UniProtKB/Swiss-Prot annotation:
Keyword Cytoplasm: yes
Lipid-linked residues (N-myristoyl glycine): G2
Record keywords, A-Z: Cytoplasm, Hydrolase, Lipoprotein, Magnesium, Manganese, Membrane, Metal-binding, Myristate, Nucleus, Phosphoprotein, Protein phosphatase
UniProt subunit comment: Monomer. Interacts with SMAD2; the interaction dephosphorylates SMAD2 in its C-terminal SXS motif resulting in disruption of the SMAD2/SMAD4 complex, SMAD2 nuclear export and termination of the TGF-beta-mediated signaling. Interacts with SMAD2; the interaction dephosphorylates SMAD2 in its C-terminal SXS motif resulting in disruption of the SMAD2/SMAD4 complex, SMAD2 nuclear export and termination of the TGF-beta-mediated signaling. Interacts with the phosphorylated form of IKBKB/IKKB.
Name of the protein in question: Protein phosphatase 1A
Residues annotated as binding Mn(2+) 2: D60, D239, D282
Length: 382
């Protein structure tokens, strides 16, 4: 927890799929962290009469990956199989769903605690969870921790989840009522989130219920009625993404990428790469879920993208030639470009989103460069 590599691991895990009128893509990268502690779930078509429902979630583990991995495999079952979710006969009501989600979180947390104790060595890992449960009529946003989800509707951020931070007044009050404190914006000066699954060292205050502990496993659940005409896409991501991109920035960037490609894996990869180049030092995971009215590929946008790439290619050549003797390093090239007013850069991503294009041209013109120097310089680009 908190340890970093000498250079980032940039290999990605990808997946994509479609069904129920939805398309999704996902990407995850270990980045600078010593371990990959993120996990994710993507299920289109749920069992037990919920074939028209879908579930997606991102889990950001800390102090180990055990809780995140267990949740990605079992949280959905705990949600849909409890009696609060099922309710009476027929499709579950909105309140059934919201109550069932909450019950599912509390049940899986208690189940993991009992399992950990039986192994005679309490697991100290924990995980945030952000997800969406999508029915034909509603989208249920689920959040526990500081990962975040947002809905882009009619080209704007319509909704986003609130991060559960110890400095939040309501969270701080609960922490203090449980005998804890908030120091340097952390629970007891240590944990940066005030709600999470796992983290059982923070859930052992006698006389307090599970939602009254220093760290609570209770999710916030918001139901949003779907709008076939206006709903465009949903983004779920861990804080490795949000640390360097704001809600509107990421919404604008994703929308611009959807206008030049319909490959959702590629869009997610561009998000992850861009955040790495913007300075994210954490694991990074993102899921993009597109509704039928998501932005479509535009011939005009594709043309502008090609023109931008050609412009950058020419500028890299000019910068290298201007150097004269010897070839400037990639950091110098990036800093030079960053000082210029380059037209038509992707909104939200800006020059960082074009790092791969620039580096490809640089490598072609400088085939004898030292791969161990420039390729790892993502933390000092300009």
């Amino acid at each position: 927890m908190g340890a970093f590599l000498d250079k980032p691991k940039m290999e990605k895990h990808n997946a994509q799929g479609q069904g129920n009128g939805l398309r999704y893509g996902l990407s995850s990268m270990q980045g600078w962290r010593v371990e990959m502690e993120d996990a994710h779930t993507a299920v289109i078509g749920l069992p037990s009469g919920l074939e028209t429902w879908s579930f997606f979630a991102v889990y950001d583990g800390h102090a180990g990956s055990q809780v995140a991995k267990y949740c990605c495999e079992h949280l959905l079952d705990h949600i849909t199989n409890n009696q609060d979710f099922k309710g009476s006969a027929g499709a579950p009501s909105v309140e059934n769903v919201k109550n069932g989600i909450r019950t599912g979180f509390l049940e899986i947390d208690e189940h993991m605690r009992v399992m950990s104790e039986k192994k005679h060595g309490a697991d100290r890992s924990g995980s945030t969870a952000v997800g969406v449960l999508i029915s034909p009529q509603h989208t249920y946003f689920i959040n526990c921790g500081d990962s975040r989800g947002l809905l882009c509707r009619n080209r704007k951020v319509h909704f986003f989840t609130q991060d559960h931070k110890p400095s939040n007044p309501l969270e701080k009050e609960r922490i203090q009522n449980a005998g804890g404190s908030v120091m340097i914006q952390r629970v007891n000066g240590s944990l940066a989130v005030s709600r999470a699954l796992g983290d059982f060292d923070y859930k052992c205050v006698h006389g307090k219920g599970p939602t009254e502990q220093l760290v609570s496993p209770e999710p916030e659940v918001h139901d949003i009625e779907r709008s076939e005409e206006d709903d465009q896409f949903i983004i779920l991501a861990c804080d490795g993404i949000w640390d360097v991109m704001g809600n509107e920035e990421l919404c604008d960037f994703v929308r611009s990428r959807l206008e030049v490609t319909d490959d959702l894996e590629k869009v997610c990869n561009e998000v992850v790469d861009t955040c790495l180049y913007k300075g994210s030092r954490d694991n990074m995971s993102v899921i993009l879920i597109c509704f039928p009215n998501a932005p479509k590929v535009s011939a005009e946008a594709v043309k502008k993208e090609a023109e931008l790439d050609k412009y950058l290619e020419n500028r890299v050549e000019e910068i290298i030639k201007k150097q004269g003797e010897g070839v400037p390093d990639l950091v110098h090239v990036m800093r030079t470009l960053a000082s210029e007013n380059i037209p038509s850069l992707p909104p939200g991503g800006e020059l960082a989103s074009k790092r791969n294009v620039i580096e490809a041209v640089y490598n072609r013109l400088n085939p004898y460069k030292n791969d161990d120097t420039d390729s790892a310089s993502t933390d000092d680009m300009w």
